[in-house]
């Protein structure tokens, strides 16, 4: 179809041997099905780097990839939607990718994804709740914005719980051995 600018595929973890890789494999499978569902809302928000196909004329029309964005695969998807293109998901095709093997590597990857997502959200925030841009303005931007707020609140809550637990443990330890 003329208005389809990109097609993305299912991404699977290559050689998932350890627990952290197997957990990511489950995450990637769920994400693939989520993308398929989001296709019906014209809201596929990312065209993952391991394997996405683009129409050359559409990429040229929107100005190509933003090389300064940490998550250019999210940014290009949003830009294509801004220009009224559609992105499709093919569950029939699949690609395998390497994922982090350590918690530290996973943390670095997710930090990069979060910062890039914030870059993209701030770049397109002027479309927030803008009906002219359909699901980009009415669904994706509000969803991403709320998810960032919830993530930050969750981080503070988690930190508060850990701090209280540590403080309680130290207080108990001091009181018990005094």
What do the PLM-derived regions correspond to, one by one?
Residues 56-57, 74, 93:
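Structural detector for helix-capping/boundary residues
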Residues 16, 97-98:
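Generic structural signal for helix capping and beta-alpha/helix-loop junctions
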Residues 7-10, 90, 98:
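Structural motif
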Residues 2-70, 111-114, 118-122:
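Long helical/loop segments within the catalytic core of UDP-sugar-dependent glycosyltransferases
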Residues 61-62, 98, 106:
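Residues that scaffold the ATP/ADP-binding catalytic core of kinase and kinase-like folds
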Residues 101-178:
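Basic/Trp-rich segment in TM-proximal cytosolic loops or flexible interdomain/linker regions
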Residues 76-77, 106:
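Short, hydrophobic alpha-helical packing/hinge segments within bilobed ligand-binding/sensory domains
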């Amino acid at each position: 179809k003329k208005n389809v600018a990109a097609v993305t595929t299912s991404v699977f973890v290559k050689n998932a041997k350890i627990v952290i890789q197997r957990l990511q494999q489950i995450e990637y499978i769920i994400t693939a099905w989520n993308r398929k569902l989001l296709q019906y809302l014209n809201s596929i928000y990312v065209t993952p780097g391991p394997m996405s196909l683009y129409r050359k004329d559409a990429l040229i029309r929107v100005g190509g990839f933003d090389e300064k964005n940490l998550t250019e695969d999210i940014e290009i998807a949003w830009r294509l939607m801004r220009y009224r293109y559609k992105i499709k998901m093919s569950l029939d095709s699949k690609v395998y990718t390497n994922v982090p093997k350590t918690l530290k590597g996973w943390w670095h990857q997710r930090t990069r994804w979060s910062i890039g997502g914030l870059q993209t959200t701030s770049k397109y925030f002027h479309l927030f709740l803008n009906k002219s841009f359909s699901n980009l303005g009415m669904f994706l931007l509000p969803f991403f914005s709320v998810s960032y707020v919830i993530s930050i609140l969750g981080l503070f809550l988690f930190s508060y719980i850990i701090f209280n637990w540590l403080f309680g443990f130290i207080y108990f330890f001091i009181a018990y051995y005094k």
